[in-house]
């Protein structure tokens, strides 16, 4: 079992990653993975894309066929086009409904596994110290603030540790992003200089 310190830290890492990547990006990726599974929804999605290609192809053929000169051929294409389009719209409507249900389930699972878990930990472990502070190292008021609201005095509370983890992860991510931008800038600056030396 992970200690409370690491559990809270990993919950905040997960929250940060979800917020950084974006919920809609995660939803789209999970929907694409779900469509790879052998389910009826995946079968409907494949059928939908096949019908879409067929509708586009028939529409192209109708546009290339003169409705006055080749009316019989054009009318036959039109009937096939209308039938395929109706099938496509029916499957598309069912697929849209299934995607909405899937998105709802993913949003609930995502909330429960990140923010919901964070709130649960705050209430369940509100009187539990995350770790104890060395005796006499901090003034009484600082010990009280670090144990706020319900942890024993002389320890760090779950609420304070939550704030520390969230802030530390955000700061470390900013530092990492700045270092990455700087390294890319240096690499880009070296590339033109190296090309200039080769041409000389």
Curated annotation (Swiss-Prot):
Location(s), subcellular: Endoplasmic reticulum membrane
Keywords: Coiled coil, Endoplasmic reticulum, Membrane, Transmembrane, Transmembrane helix, Transport
Alphabetical GO biological process terms: tail-anchored membrane protein insertion into ER membrane
Superkingdom, taxonomy of origin: Eukaryota
GO cellular component, one term: endoplasmic reticulum membrane
Similarity remark: Belongs to the WRB/GET1 family.
Classification via InterPro entries: Get1, Get1_fungi, Helix_hairpin_bin_sf
Coiled coil spans: 42-99
Gene3D superfamilies recorded: Helix hairpin bin
Transmembrane region(s): 5-24, 111-131, 156-172
Protein's recorded name: Protein get1
Membrane topology: Multi-pass membrane protein
Matching Pfam families: CHD5
Main location: endoplasmic reticulum
Subunit structure of this chain's protein: Interacts with get3.
Gene it is expressed from: get1
Job of this protein: Required for the post-translational delivery of tail-anchored (TA) proteins to the endoplasmic reticulum. Acts as a membrane receptor for soluble get3, which recognizes and selectively binds the transmembrane domain of TA proteins in the cytosol.
A Gene Ontology molecular function term of the record: protein-membrane adaptor activity
Cytoplasmic membrane side: 25-110, 173-200
Residue numbers on the Lumenal membrane side: 1-4, 132-155
